[in-house]
Regions:
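Expand to "…catalyze enediolate/carbanion chemistry for C-C bond making/breaking, isomerization
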Residues: 29-214
């Protein structure tokens, strides 16, 4: 759990710490690509943008600069291959075309502790590709839990997503965002206040509105 919090801090600094509904990864369900994509985009539009949990997200969403990659990996090794491919693609792609990537992997690492352990592999991949200072990876999971919290604490929802997800971020985009929003360091606390005020009941009502389209 502590390791997960360390990785989450990267994303929290950007203010992209968002709450996700309690969808759970279940490999036996084998949700199709469209279902996974729709759930992820609904999470983005309602939590990240709709609750203004990330002031920076709306622009890249409107400009269609977010890449959604639904991994079919069923082993950590296959997921690592997808991660390396996506890191390389993001590195080599014009930010005006793809600014950030959400690598969603519904059929692997559904257990949060396994996911947490895999984050060390993620760090090693970034280092091996010599992308330190260029790209970073933040973490989201349906059962995300910060150290020192109870599983159902609303604070944990700041990093809960429909499916296990790795968020690939450009360091340059973080720098630009922080310059554009001088109070960026306060976003995490603001998000926690928003979630606590909303509460579990309010959160559940938010997800009873049906599906969104990207």
């Amino acid at each position: 759990v502590a390791g997960a919090a360390r990785h989450a801090a990267k994303c929290l600094a950007l203010g992209f710490a968002v709450a996700g509904p309690r969808w759970r990864d279940n490999a036996t369900m084998h949700p199709d690509h469209d279902t996974i994509l729709a759930a992820t985009q609904t999470w983005l539009t309602r939590a990240v943008i709709g609750l203004n949990l990330c002031p920076f997200a709306k622009a890249v969403h409107v400009k269609n600069q977010i890449r959604y990659k639904i991994s079919q990996a069923t082993t950590p090794e296959a997921l690592l291959e997808d991660l390396i491919a996506e890191l390389t693609l993001l590195r080599d792609t014009d930010p005006e075309v793809v600014d950030t990537t959400l690598l969603v992997h519904p059929d692997i690492l559904g257990d949060f502790m396994d996911y947490n352990d895999f984050l060390d592999v993620v760090d090693a991949a970034v280092e091996e590709l010599e992308l330190d200072g260029i790209l970073q990876v933040a973490s989201f999971h349906p059962d995300y839990q910060f150290s020192g919290t109870e599983p159902d604490d609303i604070d944990n929802f700041s990093n809960r997503s429909p499916y296990p997800t790795l968020h690939l971020i450009r360091e340059s985009s973080i720098e630009q965002a922080v310059q554009a929003f001088p109070d960026a360091s306060d976003i995490y606390e603001t998000n926690i206040q928003t979630l606590r005020k909303l509460g579990h009941e309010g959160w559940q009502k938010l997800w009873q509105l049906g599906s969104d389209k990207a």
